[in-house]
Amino acid sequence: MKSGVIPSSAVGQKINEWYRYIRTFSVPDAEVLKAEIQQELKHMQHDSNLLLYYSLMEFRHQLMLDYLEPLEKLNIEDQPSLSELSRNIDSNQADLKGLLDYYVNFFRGMYEFDKREFISAITYYKQAEKKLSFVADHIERAEFYFKIAEAYYYMKQTYFSLINIKNAYEIYVEQETYNVRIIQCHFVFGVNLMDERNFEQAARHFKLALNMAQAEQKAQLVGRAYYNLGLCYYNQDLLDPAIDYFEKAVSTFESSRIVNSLPQAYFLITLIYYKQGKHDKASEYHKRGYEYAKETDDADYAVKFEFLQSLYLDQPNEEGIERCFQYLKNKNMYADIEDLALEVAKYYYEQKWFKLSASYFLQVEEARKQIQRSEGLYEIEI
């Protein structure tokens, strides 16, 4: 080896340490180590697998940043986009085996999840699962269980979500530095319990998560805990306490400039005010929520705000409603169709337009059937 050339094995050990900081959401430590590794790569002996491993960790690093805090608050500049990193990884893949194959599929699943492409995410996760035997680190196994549990929840596969989140939680709770993940586990427990109509137990998880998030001083998690508590009350038709918690979520996100989380909370506040007949308040939140959806390039919530326009302000506009549903069908977002079709069915029922109401109740039933059928879609070969 030439003098001054750094062994790839030494850089590999640093990348492993970098990943430990990423998994514990230790942003400053992760940033420092990333910068050190970038310098060492310039003097490292050539190793194509190690370079791909670095690219994967850079990708995972960016996923952490995108979730946890806005970049402008962290004072981190010139971060590559996830789409750029994804293209770089795809272009550098060879015949991957073992642990690298696991990471490629696992991190790609996280990327697809971030785009709300849930079936695609689970498809990649299940490819990663085939290589899970190469993962000796029990924390990394917990990461896998946690991420696939999240995706199963969004596809309304409650049984599989709860099994995996229990596996993840039992590993994280034995550690001293994984409080962020423990908080997130409580979120996943809670939302699944809501789907089982066990609201009391769900609220316990959310309140415990809120207390932990406040202790950790993580604004994103505090806001998410408030949002989940609002959702818990909303699903029980307790609209006033639901709005109180959604407002707290909005206040937390806005004060910390966590704009990516705002469209979701604004949407439900807007919907509640429309349902209560408070159209002036609804219009105020509708306008701001739609602007946030556009600002953050959140096409899903932009379409949902357009749905509210079609239902409540355009007398209603059947073509606009169906345009929203077609968009959601194209993304296999049948859980969202179920929720929104139910809103339309109830609205028409209250207006005594029973034939239209019945047609949307049938759409609710069809969406539920599609959710039940969705498990087989995860086996698509990629």
Curated annotation (Swiss-Prot):
Inhibited by the competence and sporulation stimulating factor (CSF), encoded by phrC, which prevents RapC-ComA interaction. It comes from the Bacteria. One of its GO terms (cellular component) is cytoplasm. Induction: Part of the rapC-phrC operon, which is controlled by the P1 promoter. Transcription from the P1 promoter is activated by high cell density through the phosphorylated form of ComA. RapC is part of an autoregulatory loop, and it negatively regulates its own expression. It is found in: Cytoplasm. Keywords: Competence, Cytoplasm, Repeat, TPR repeat. Disruption phenotype: Deletion of the gene increases the expression of the ComA-dependent genes rapA and rapC itself. InterPro entries: Bac_ResReg_Asp_Phosphatase, TPR-like_helical_dom_sf, TPR_rpt. One of its GO terms (biological process) is establishment of competence for transformation. TPR repeats lie at residues 102-138, 149-182, 183-216, 223-256, 263-296. SMART domains: TPR. Changing residue 195 to N: Prevents inhibition by CSF. Homodimer. Interacts specifically with the C-terminal DNA-binding domain of ComA. Interacts with CSF. Belongs to the Rap family. Involved in the regulation of genetic competence development. Inhibits the activity of ComA, a transcriptional factor that regulates the development of genetic competence. Acts by binding to ComA, independently of its phosphorylation state, leading to the inhibition of ComA DNA-binding activity. Does not dephosphorylate phospho-ComA and does not affect the phosphorylation level of the ComP-ComA system. This is Regulatory protein RapC. It comes from Bacillus subtilis (strain 168). The lineage of its organism: Bacteria, Bacillati, Bacillota, Bacilli, Bacillales.
